[in-house]
């Protein structure tokens, strides 16, 4: 059920692994042909084989994808807006820690050791730890999902 002059989300089937290439070709075609009515090209990181277009209608999307290499056609129906928001929203991974917290490493080569948080790199999803049980200062970087907070 397409709504006129509304932003709808269309899933384009794509050859697996070619999502970025198809998105770039779509962008180039939109720019060179000065196509109006396309608002976004979304390449979902966890949805292989699809590129999502935010557009006014099917009458704009179908001619746009015609002849694009590695584009296999449109998926049936529209994607709901809340599904798109789930796909593109950033998810927090692991516990929330601050520098100075004492944590326990729960997996990896340092499993079971106590450590103090030196620095949190949220963009990478990692923390830099100072291992407390070593004889000399030993700093290691581990993913956030490999630690558990012991003391704050």
From Swiss-Prot:
UniProt keywords, alphabetically: Transcription, Transcription regulation
GO biological process: regulation of DNA-templated transcription; transcription elongation-coupled chromatin remodeling
Coiled coil location: none
InterPro entries: KOW, NGN-domain, NGN-like_dom, NGN_dom_sf, Rib_uL2_dom2, Ribosomal_uL24_CS, Spt5_arc, Translation_prot_SH3-like_sf
Residue ranges of domain KOW in the record: 99-128
SUPFAM superfamilies: Translation proteins SH3-like domain
GO CC annotation terms, alphabetical: ribosome
One Gene Ontology term of the molecular function aspect: translation elongation factor activity
Subunit annotation: Heterodimer composed of Spt4 and Spt5. Interacts with RNA polymerase (RNAP).
Cited function: Stimulates transcription elongation.
NCBIfam families named among the record's database cross-references: KOW_elon_Spt5
Protein family per UniProt: Belongs to the archaeal Spt5 family.
Protein name: Transcription elongation factor Spt5
Species of provenance: Saccharolobus solfataricus (strain ATCC 35092 / DSM 1617 / JCM 11322 / P2)
Gene it is expressed from: spt5
């Amino acid at each position: 059920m397409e709504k006129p002059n509304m932003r709808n989300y269309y899933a384009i089937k794509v050859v697996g692994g070619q999502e970025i290439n198809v998105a770039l070709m779509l962008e180039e075609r939109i720019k060179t042909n000065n196509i109006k009515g396309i608002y976004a090209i979304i390449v979902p990181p966890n949805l292989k084989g699809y590129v999502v277009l935010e557009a006014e209608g099917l009458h704009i999307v179908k001619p746009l994808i015609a002849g694009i290499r590695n584009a296999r056609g449109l998926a049936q129906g529209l994607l709901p807006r809340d599904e798109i928001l789930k796909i593109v929203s950033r998810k927090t991974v692991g516990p929330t820690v601050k520098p100075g917290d004492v944590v326990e490493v729960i997996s990896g080569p340092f499993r079971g050791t106590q450590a103090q948080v030196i620095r949190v790199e949220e963009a990478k999803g990692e923390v830099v730890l100072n291992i407390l049980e070593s004889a000399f200062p030993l700093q290691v970087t581990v993913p956030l999902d490999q630690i558990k907070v012991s003391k704050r």
